[in-house]
């Protein structure tokens, strides 16, 4: 039988999602906990592999097990075997053809900036800190050039392995909530470092070091070296993954929950 789980995790505690030798990864911890409950080796497939330091409030995974278990075994049981910083939010049986990765139609990320003079003590690992004042309104104006289907070569990592630089951004907003600036972006898929590279350039616009139309110009130039530095990983969250309705994948509240949406 095939199961799907929704996970949340604090990426600052782990060296990214993907299993690696000699360092702690989210995938390794999840597979070890699931294997204890299944009483058999379990391998998982995730909706999107996050880098070291990147968080998730709604990472979706699927896995196959030979023997059924009650849903509570995959929630409370797995949580009791997971280390601090990783938790299951829900579990359910899914169709055998469901894929957490390939069945997804869109993914949504949030990037959170603490725009304060001094770095925060609480939530410091869950935000990026920029002490210089940022203008969220001009960042929002600039960001609209990225909505739609484009060649995002200017915003992909040099070692990105995707066969195509084209992605379709369905929504991109920048807003200020008190001391926080939230960049919220949805797309059919993302290139490696795409969100953090976009945010890095939006920060430059927010500092009034470049005009809003600079973002569109970067897109047209298709040159990563012309754009700004990659934003830090600590402010990035995978907050939602969308699937066709017939899979009946539950919606989770958008996170991180301390934002209070």
From Swiss-Prot:
The enzyme's E.C. designation: 5.4.99.12
InterPro entries registered for this protein in UniProt: PsdUridine_synth_cat_dom_sf, PsdUridine_synth_TruA, PsdUridine_synth_TruA_a/b_dom, PsdUridine_synth_TruA_C, TruA/RsuA/RluB/E/F_N
A GO molecular-function annotation: tRNA pseudouridine(38-40) synthase activity
Protein family: Belongs to the tRNA pseudouridine synthase TruA family.
Gene3D superfamilies: Pseudouridine synthase I, catalytic domain, C-terminal subdomain (3.30.70.660), Pseudouridine synthase I, catalytic domain, N-terminal subdomain (3.30.70.580)
Organism: Idiomarina loihiensis (strain ATCC BAA-735 / DSM 15497 / L2-TR)
Catalytic activity: uridine(38/39/40) in tRNA = pseudouridine(38/39/40) in tRNA
Highest taxon in the source lineage: Bacteria
Subunit structure as annotated in this protein's UniProt entry: Homodimer.
Name of the protein described by the UniProt record: tRNA pseudouridine synthase A
Transmembrane segments: none
HAMAP family referenced in this protein's UniProt entry, alphabetically: TruA (MF_00171)
Coiled-coil residues: none
Keywords: Isomerase, tRNA processing
Binding-site list for substrate: 109
Residues of the active site: 51 (nucleophile)
Any single GO BP term: tRNA pseudouridine synthesis
Pfam families: PseudoU_synth_1
The keyword tRNA processing appears for this protein: yes
Role of this protein: Formation of pseudouridine at positions 38, 39 and 40 in the anticodon stem and loop of transfer RNAs.
